[in-house]
Amino acid sequence: SPARSPALSPALRSSRCGGERRGNASDAGADLGAVQDAQLRSVDLNHIIKLLEDSDSVNLEKEQLKALKKVIKRFESGLPLKDLAQIIEILNLCAEKMNEQEAFTEPLCELIKLCGLPFQKKKLSDEVSYSVAVSKSIAQLGYLMRVPSSQVRIQICKCVVSFYNTELPRKLPSGYQPTSANYKIQMAELGGLAETLVLSLALVENQLTEKLWVLKALQHLSSSGVNCRLMMKAQAASRLCLYLNGVDPSGQLVFRSSEILWNLLENTSKEEVVNQLSSLECVHALKEVFADLLMHGFRHYDRQLRNDLLVIATLLAENPAAPMIESGFTKLLIVLATLTEVKIPNPLVKGLKLTYSYEDFEMKKLLFNLIGVLSKDPCAVQLLSENDVIPALLCYVKPNQKPGFHDWSAAQYEELQLHAIAILASVAPLLVEKYLSCQANTLLLVFLEWCIGQDPFIGQGNSFHGTGGRGNKLAQMRYSLRVLRSVVSLYDDAVNLNLCDQGAISQLLDILKYAANKSKEKEDAILLEIQADILFLLSALCENDIHRKELFSYEGVDILIPFIQMDPKKLHSGLGHSCLLFSALDCLWSCVIGCYMAEDYFLEKQGIFLLLDLLALKQKNLYNIILGILVEFCDNPKTTSHISTWRGEKDQTAANLLIQLWRQEELELGVQRDRYGKIVDMKRPLAGSFQKQQGVIPTPANCPSFAIVEVSENIRAKLYSLLCKLGFESLPGLSAQDFVTLAIIRHYMDFKVGEVWSELCAELKEEFRPVGSDEEALKVISEISEDTGRMVAALQTEVLESQHHQEIQEEEKTYTKIQGIHKQREMISKSWQNFLTRTSNYEALKKAKRLQEKSIEASRSKLKTQNGSVHSTDIKGLGTTVSSSQ
């Protein structure tokens, strides 16, 4: 009746009493339907809340349930944002009543179900206006997981899952529109729902169905980075890992837990997830479920899940704090990695057979990768040795004939082969004795011989390790050389001797020629890397061994020369030319210097000229190594003449180039000089700006001071050594400025000794007070250093004055020369004017003729000759005074 209906508003009741009556039955029915709709539309939520809060609510159970049904009916299309806070309050009141009255379970679940529908808004701004209230309301859903009802908990999880359903309701109340698709998800993030659900896992630990629903909800929530961070606060990773080996015939427990772990790894800090998984309990759980899937998982899905867990295990292996070895997981994985190659029965994998499916192929690659990770853990090295990892990996260092692997395709075998050889480069240096006992050097050299052979082979080049190897054997060559590089770089005498005894130097030179010829056809990063690695191997093998340098000499120098002649433009190509050039220079230093036969051949090939050409490019990163090589080469008496003979652009000499480099170095160091390059600071003429700022820092006796360290940190010491070898007298091609700088270079060692004494004095005065005689001696030493500075400054001034005087003399000579040129030009001009006058002016011509006649008459003899012929001085037809040729 209307009196018992708390859902009706006063306005509706008055309209029913005073409204206009209809005249026929159909109008009355329509009116009754409208009234019922109005009743539903005008549910008084505050009244219902008061009704549920009534202390005598036990007697009002039917009334309360009826009111709740009206609420459910009223909001069957979705909850308006403005009413959401009251609905959640009703939910909480229902949850409280459930403890004593089970009848409230169903309406509570129905109300929770409504929360899964899209919320409704009247205005666009409602989403922002109600955001705080909505986020708190959604958070309350998570808190309702405390209600001890399986039905309620499952419904909450279903509600959360429905947040990700973008399907819109079929009908909406007039004036309302659904909120945006991601609104609920954003509010769930804001309210921290994910963290609450993770904590609720403790409540459903023994209820499999509820647990699976919570995991399903978390699986959806974990697609967001914000939710993943909230979950990590609740230790989600460790909680989920412990569920991995729980009893679940459906397999959903492992699947959903591992899926959430993956999302956590992708969306949060990998280190934080790994740290949470690094407890002994978690590692043991991971090991158990992995072993179970390995031995009993035959479905495609099981193998994929097994591989996912293997990736997580690899991440754990990267963490030194994870008890992988203590749990026995590491040993299981190593045994599994070498199972098909070593074929030694092991109880850990008894009865296991690989099917050569794609998932097993992926697992094999993951296991190889894991060995690479374990090689970085010193504690795992013993396990790698005991389980024959080196022999297993060496099974792949053979020509591509698929020995014993009849079920892998050619492309798969090649990928495994390259991966295994790449991992061998990481493991071999740790197990050198095992490496040598397996004749690994021999296998690698034979394999490299096959790589440059003419056998028909088409590399697939499909994998990461196969880059650049399509249609050739370059990928195999690249990784085999990496293995050799990794063991040779140990500088272990046994390894290097074993290689050289098998003719490695000659074979490496052949491979280098092969790669260099290939590089002429098409340069790429792989070929450049191969060449650089071979040059490094030769450097390491030949260093400090004259006999090996002699084996290298002629053929090696011929190969090195083109590298030093490299086009400078290629150094910045980004392909690796710069690294290749450095490797070539290092090889020159290690394989040529110290062997006179090789040195002389290098000089004969004009190698010194090439080095100076490189130095003249002024590539700062090349200075140290080139200058070092030149200094070492100067021990050969023929070298200095080659250096002195060299000429660069604009006829630049080597001495001028070296002095220019000195000035450039001092400019970068901030050494104080005046505008003419003269010394300014007599006490510390070599000190740069940074050295002066540092001052004198007391250091232990076994630590070099700044003045000593500075020698190796810049090129001035090498430039000084080289100029000492050339001699400071009669250096060609130097200007006055060069001589000013040369005066400093010549006294570099004196200044450096003075710097060391200066540091020594400063350190002594900080802790001791020298006695009179010692103080006097220190004072004399300091004065000697300053006197040297003043002497050099005076010499520099003398050079500059001499240059100035010479310039004045040159200027005077030039001026005199210019005067002579002007005078000569005036005479030529005057002569030309006379010539023009004589040839162009008629009066002048007549005058010239008269003068000519007078001159002729005057020259005649006064005595008349009898019977003599008289010749006329006039020539008929003469019309010019110059020859016809002009």
Model-derived regions, located:
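Extended cytosolic coiled-coil "rod" domains of large eukaryotic scaffolding/tethering proteins
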Residues: T338, E449, K513, Q565, ...
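Well-ordered alpha-helical segments within folded domains of soluble proteins
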Residues: D308-V311, K365-N369, L418-A422, Y479-R485, ...
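Alpha-solenoid helical-repeat scaffold
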Residues: A34, R74-S77, V427, S437, ...
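Elongated alpha-helical scaffolds that mediate protein-protein interactions in large eukaryotic proteins
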Residues: S1-E288, M295-N307, T314-K365, V373-C395, ...
